[in-house]
Structures are given as C-alpha cells and as structure tokens.
C-alpha cells in the first residue's frame, strides 16, 4: 500500500472562531483559547487505514522542549482528555479526516507551529500544517483566568471600546477610549511586546515557558507598555511639552499607538500619561484573553518613600515648594485591574489584581507595578507580592500640608486621613455609567475596621504596632520623626473658610469666585489673607502663577465676609495646560498665630455634542452631526474634528472646521459606514492651536445587514 500524506488542511476558522469567541480577530491564522478543543479537517492522499497512526507535534518559541512545556508530541486517542495536549478523531469520510485537538488549561499562550506525522507500515510522512495562536481562556473553569459571569466576559474581554474617568473628585468626566484589540495587526503586536521584553531577549526559551502563568505575563506587559527600561511602547511626559511627539490628550485609543510602535520598529511612541498607559495595557491584556478593566482613583497618592503619607510643603501664600515636596497627590490616577487566580498567594487573593504601567516607581529594578491583589490591599496584607505598599498608599495614605518658614522650621497647617483614595471608579458592565468600587479597596473611612487594617499595614511594613493613624514621617532633609499623635485633631479653629464659584468656570471666560471667611468666635479677629493661583497639570504640579495678592480682613464676632476674586482670561490663557485645571490657595493668618489653608481645584468647562442622524447598519452609510462652540471671545481658525471608532471607520478621519467667530456655535456633518454590528463607540475631538482639545463620544448601535 502506498504511503499516506496530507494534501490540504482546513482550519475551520468560522466554526472554531465562534466556539472560542475569537471570530473578531482578523488574523490569517486560526486563533483559539486554551483548555478547549478545536477542530481541523485534513484531506489525505488516500483513505486512512485503521492501523495507521497520526502523531501531532505542537511547538512554541525558540528551542521548544517537552521539559519546558513548550513542545508536545501526542497521537489520536479515544481516551478521555488527560493533563496534556490531546487529539481525537471526530469524523472520517473516504480521504477526509476531521480531528479534535485540545490544549491543557495551563498551556503556554502564544503562536504555535503544528506538524503531523503519519506512520504506515514502516513508511512515514511528515508535514507542517501551519501556525495558530493560543490565548488565555476566561470561559474555561480550569484556566487561572476563568471569569464566571458571561456579561463580565463580554465587557472585560470582548468589548473593544470603553470609558476612562478623569477630572477631580467633585467633577468626574468620562472620556471614550478605543481599545481596538481586534483591529489589524494588534494581536501580532501584542505577541511582539512579549518577545521584545528583556526577559525574552536574555533567555527566550525560559521566558516563553513562563507564559502559561497570568501573573508572569501581566507583570512583563506592565513593564513593556512604558519605555523606561526596555524600549517599550509608550514614553511618558508630564511637563506639558510635547515637541517631537503627540500630546497624551490627543490619543483617542490604543490602536494608533500600537501600530505606530510597530511601524517605527519598536521605537517608543511619544507621549503618554497615566490614562494612555492604562488604555494600552487594557488593549494588550484583553487581546491575549485576560479579563481587564480600567480603574480611576481620585486624589491618588504618590508616596515616594513608602511611609504611608503624602507630605506637602507650602510657603506663606500656599504655593507648593517643589524642591521640598517629594510626595504628591494627583487629582486622579488611572491603572488597570485584571481577573485571575493567585496560585502564589492562595485562593483568598484570587480575583481582581492591580496592574499599573505608568512609570512611577521601580519594582525589582524595573518600572512596573503589580499584580497586587485588591483583596490584599483591602485587608492590609501589603507584604504580599507584588508592590502592595505602593498601591495601598495610593488609596490609603494620610495627607499633610506643612508651612515652611524662612528659618527652615515647619508648621502643620492641614492634615486629613480621608482625603486620599476617593471615588475609585470604573465603567459599568453593559452601560456607560460610572461604578464606584472604593469599597473593594478599603473599608469605610474612619471606621474601626479601616483603622485596624491601617495598623496592620504599618506593622507589616515597619514591624511595629500603630497606636494612632501615623507612625513616622519624613522630615525635609531625609530625617525621620516618630509620632503617634501627628494626626490628632488640632485645637478648635477660630475661623473657617472656603472658595465659592460665582459663575460656571468656562474655558475662554474670566473666572469669578469668592473666598468666604467666617469668624467662629465671639471676639473680633484680624486675618491676613494671602491668595495664590496657578495653572496645574492633573498631577497638581504647578505650571505658572496667575494670582498673587494679599488682603487684610477684620471679622467681627460670628461675622462672615467674602473676598471677591476675578482672574481674567488673559491671565491664564497662555499657561493653561490641556488638563484645563487651575489650583487656588488661600493662606489665612490669624493675629494670634493660627493658620488656615483653603484650596480649590477648578476644571474649565467646554462644549461638544454628537448626533447620529438615522439608524446605523453594517455596510450602509449614515450621517453624523457634530456641534461645537468656540469657547473664546476671539475669532479662531485652523480647527479640525478628529474622528475615530473601531467597527465604524477604517482609519482616523480629519475634518476641517470653518473659521469660528467669538463664541459661535457651528455644526459639521460627515458620513460613516459601519463594518461591524453591535454597540460601537465613535470619538470626536475638536482640535485647535488656540485652546486645549474638546473631547466627546457617542455610542452607535449598529444593526446587522439585512
């Protein structure tokens, strides 16, 4: 009998794609998930004899070996699935054979080469069948990344767009983001990110063998999304100067960033800030099959010395002293959570894990963060891997402001144990709503349980019991002071103060506010009020001073007074950053030595609306109308709309906007032709050299073609 050979392979991409939830990947090769069988049909040179044997070989990575679990050799069997790779005959018709192949739920993920050996009466035929890609499988109960809820799998694995929350605690704004994990080349780029890592460059065989473990994979990608150590994807920039690159606020999604990294031969893409790093990390992990979401923390601590405190130093006008202040409190910070088991810690710590690709501090010599179990953070188990102290401080640190005197002494003028870690937010499953998940990270502020957890974290970090909220703090110059009573309430204040916004703060308009002071005593008091204001980045780093004035105020018994404040547009327009944020401070000096510091964050408003004029259907053009308003009291030209949306546009659109008169409202129409059904996010930005980008998005519900 003549030898047998394979003449053709049908990878059954449609059938396998539907079964594995991978039909959206546009790759030429098959994409499947581990721990689940997939089928392929072989056309043979003749009918297969019952005594003839099919032996399959799977290989991934360089120097693949069975010892490293990067190679598997197995033959068809009627037995039940074992722990390794298996193959079974599904159907046979003359010269056609359909086989079912299955990987173990702990298989290494990545690109595989599949080969077959047909043995017949001492005759052998070998053939490479081709390559396929194996991903993590949140649908497989035995996979470490298993997620039980189908609604959550749809949101956190398959949704290719989302919302990132930015702003300040009392003014949270939603920004659309195009994850685009199913766009052209994105899967290949995500696999390239793993292959470009230092671990792979140094020892590729060992690195690939570790890719069965989501803990390892997410930690590698957390480092590779930033460029600080490894020519990773995105280069950070927080100074407001973006020459030679793209402003972080100009990005509308991850696809353009990842494609630019590939086309630039892996040169870091300029520039990113926290939400950009988080958006890209979310794309990569969803693409590889790990359920991932973007999380925003408002009043987020950056505790450089891990003493669970943010110490801010100010002068007599309340201005931050940059040379003394090493810690910081960002208006918001954005990171990721991914869902998987912690085999290294135990089942109590399974579930959501914090990952942060923003390069803030080094972890084991590399700029990365996590995975840190959210449960471990809530319970104060900061000693557990990875980077628990840093994440715990981001949501739980104490906040103290010190007045720095000319004689280099300092005086505490403000302290708050509840200021850090507010309104921790993520997008709701299946809707655009904001969900507050603060209770996943910590017990209610001020509760007995919260105090116990804080004390536990201090003990884990410093090996001492905390009798109060605070154990030690860093002095300027690096010396430390042990204090258990540092955050005990100060003496009862004799005055109170707050800023009141008199008119909505609109971009392009003068700002009108008042400082409201109240005498809380039955005696008259004199107060010197030093006012300052500055444009700031979202990290609260000052950019330029726009207000500096002093007032002498006499307050009668129980009297209240207002100090009116006006900041003209001409004062701030040249120095306003794309964050559109201003910080006001009032240092109130009472005659008898008491100090009161009052601060106010202001975010300037803008306007854009987007309407889809009719039903949207795959393959049918539909008109979109965008209405914008020139926020300035001057004529502007050279404006454009930048439009992006996965499944709605093949590439970014740039649409010129006619010259806008002062505060003019104008509408622009354009057509889109959807290529995919379901809810799709269309992002539209008004871009101008005269003012920061004005961003908007709308969800377009696309019907299937009739």
From Swiss-Prot:
Keywords: Acyltransferase, Calcium, Cytoplasm, Disease variant, Metal-binding, Neurodegeneration, Spinocerebellar ataxia, Transferase. It catalyses: L-glutaminyl-[protein] + L-lysyl-[protein] = [protein]-L-lysyl-N(6)-5-L-glutamyl-[protein] + NH4(+). Binds up to 3 Ca(2+) cations per subunit. Its main location: cytoplasm. Transmembrane segments: none annotated. Its EC number is 2.3.2.13. One of its GO terms (cellular component) is cytoplasm. This is Protein-glutamine gamma-glutamyltransferase 6.
């Amino acid at each position: 009998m003549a030898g047998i050979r394979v003449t053709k392979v049908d990878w059954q991409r449609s059938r396998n794609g539907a079964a594995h939830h991978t039909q959206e990947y546009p790759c030429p090769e098959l994409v499947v998930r581990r721990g689940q069988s997939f089928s392929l049909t072989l056309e043979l040179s003749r009918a297969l004899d019952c005594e003839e044997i099919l032996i399959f070989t799977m290989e991934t990575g360089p120097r693949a070996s069975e010892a490293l679990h990067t190679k598997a050799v197995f033959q068809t069997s009627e037995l039940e699935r074992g722990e390794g790779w298996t193959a079974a005959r599904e159907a046979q018709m003359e010269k056609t054979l359909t086989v079912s192949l299955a990987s173990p739920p702990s298989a290494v993920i990545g690109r595989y080469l599949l080969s077959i050996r047909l043995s017949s009466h001492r005759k052998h035929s070998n053939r490479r069948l081709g390559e396929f890609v194996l991903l993590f499988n949140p649908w497989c109960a035995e996979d470490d990344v298993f997620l039980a809820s189908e609604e959550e799998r749809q949101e956190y694995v398959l949704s290719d767009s989302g919302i990132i929350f930015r702003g300040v605690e009392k003014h949270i704004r939603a920004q659309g983001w195009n994850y685009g994990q199913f766009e052209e080349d994105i899967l290949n780029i995500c696999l390239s990110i793993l292959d470009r890592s230092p671990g792979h460059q140094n020892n590729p065989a060992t690195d690939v063998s570790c890719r069965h473990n989501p803990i390892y994979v997410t930690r590698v990608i957390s480092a590779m999304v930033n460029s600080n150590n490894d020519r990773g994807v995105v280069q950070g920039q927080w100074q407001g100067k973006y020459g030679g690159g793209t402003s972080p606020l100009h990005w509308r999604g991850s696809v353009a960033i990842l494609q630019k990294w590939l086309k630039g031969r892996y040169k870091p893409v300029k520039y990113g800030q926290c939400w950009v790093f988080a958006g890209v990390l979310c794309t990569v992990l969803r693409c590889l099959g790990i359920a991932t979401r973007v999380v925003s923390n408002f009043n987020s601590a950056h505790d450089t010395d891990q003493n669970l405190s943010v110490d801010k130093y100010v002068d007599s006008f309340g201005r931050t002293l940059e040379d003394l202040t090493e810690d910081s409190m960002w208006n918001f910070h954005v990171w990721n959570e991914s869902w998987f088991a912690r085999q290294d810690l135990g089942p109590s710590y399974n579930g959501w894990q914090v990952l942060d690709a923003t390069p803030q501090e080094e972890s084991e010599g590399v700029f990365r963060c996590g995975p840190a179990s959210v449960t471990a953070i809530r319970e104060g188990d900061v000693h557990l891997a990875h980077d628990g102290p840093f994440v715990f401080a981001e949501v739980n640190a104490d906040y103290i402001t010190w007045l720095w005197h000319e004689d280099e002494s300092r005086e505490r003028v403000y302290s708050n144990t509840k200021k850090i870690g507010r309104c921790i937010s993520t997008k709701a499953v299946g809707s655009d709503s904001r969900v507050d998940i603060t209770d996943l990270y910590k017990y209610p502020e001020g509760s007995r349980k919260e105090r116990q957890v804080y004390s536990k974290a201090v003990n884990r970090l410093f090996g001492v019991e905390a009798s109060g909220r605070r154990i030690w703090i860093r002095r300027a110059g690096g010396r430390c002071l042990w204090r258990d009573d540092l955050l005990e309430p100060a003496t009862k204040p004799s005055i109170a103060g707050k800023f009141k916004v008199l008119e909505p703060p609109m971009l392009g308009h003068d700002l009108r506010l008042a400082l409201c002071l109240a005498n809380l005593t039955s005696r008259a008091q004199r107060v010197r009020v030093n006012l300052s204001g500055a444009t700031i980045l979202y990290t609260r780093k000052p950019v330029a001073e726009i207000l500096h004035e002093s007032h002498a105020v006499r307050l009668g018994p129980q009297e209240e007074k207002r100090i009116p404040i006006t900041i003209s547009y001409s004062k701030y327009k040249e120095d306003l950053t794309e964050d559109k944020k201003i910080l006001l401070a009032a240092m109130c000096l009472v005659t008898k030595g008491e100090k009161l510091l009052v601060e106010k964050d202001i975010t300037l408003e803008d306007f854009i609306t987007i309407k889809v004029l009719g039903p949207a259907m795959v393959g049918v053009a539909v008109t979109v109308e965008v209405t914008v308003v020139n926020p300035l009291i001057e004529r502007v030209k050279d404006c454009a709309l930048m439009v992006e949306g996965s499944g709605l546009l093949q590439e970014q659109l740039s649409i010129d906007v006619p010259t806008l008169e002062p505060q003019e409202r104008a509408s622009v129409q354009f057509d889109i032709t959807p290529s995919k059904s379901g809810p799709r996010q269309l992002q539209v930005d008004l871009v101008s050299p005269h003012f920061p980008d004005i961003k908007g998005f709308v969800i377009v519900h696309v019907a299937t073609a009739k």
